[in-house]
Amino acid sequence: YKSAGVYAYFAYVKKQLDIIKPDIFWEVNTIIPINLGGSFKTMITIHDMFPIEYVEYFGQVYSMYFKYNLKKTLKNTDMILYNSEQTKSTTEEFFPEAKSIANVNAYIISNPVKKQWDNKDDDYFLYVGNMEKRKGVDLLIKGYLQYKNRGGKKKLILGGKMQEEEINQIVRSAMMLDEDITYLDYVTHDKKHELYASMSAFVFPSKAEGFGMPIIEVMRFKKPIIASNLPIFDEITDGNINTFNIRCNEYEQINNLADELLSYNTEVDTEAYANVVKRYAPDRLGKVVYDFITSD
């Protein structure tokens, strides 16, 4: 994990900082593996603690690398941007020294939907995101097949970059079993919005999530959402979505998801959705970040 590319990048950054001499350097990633020096303030962005919390998805070596280098990074960090209160809380649990560093929860800034789409229901569930186990794609496939076995009629469309061979095999096998499953691979920004506008509901069965931007995107289309009951989803949606329990064994998780697919609430609270979207609007969050950076 001492990638030559990573160290070369930060060596280049250090040279540029020596030339530019900024007041603040904002690193959009979590770890800065070298001491950048200089008289400027350094701000890092912390997305999650997954390499420590979910070693099974990242491996023991990367988990140790992450923990060691973040501890070193924090010694030279003046400000932290978090993406959620959950991430802040978890970070401070693993790294108590982070509590004494100035911080704000505001960095998630998404682009507004500019094109107008005609909302309709073409009778399909949709998942868009990375195709990996951490995102719960395996649960989605198994839950959907059970949903169909129990009389469900809607189709399932999957979109996103394939990240793991195990998930690839699960998806391919499921498509051979059920012709109502479609995998589109990576989808463009416009295609994604087109799919949002025509779906019955968005399904987001993630097992670990630092934020969940797709949920905010879907709320703009006023469509039902079915997600796992991760605490982060309660934080960002104020509990205004359908959820299924994943705090159980896999057999129960699959049953719970199938139950939700069969009986989810098709009505949405449009006012509650609008309030969530407004909270994460670019203008508002941009001002929060600006005020934080310029407050000292």
Task: State where each predicted segment sits.
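Carbohydrate transferase catalytic cores enriched for Leloir-type hexosyltransferases
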Residues: 1-296
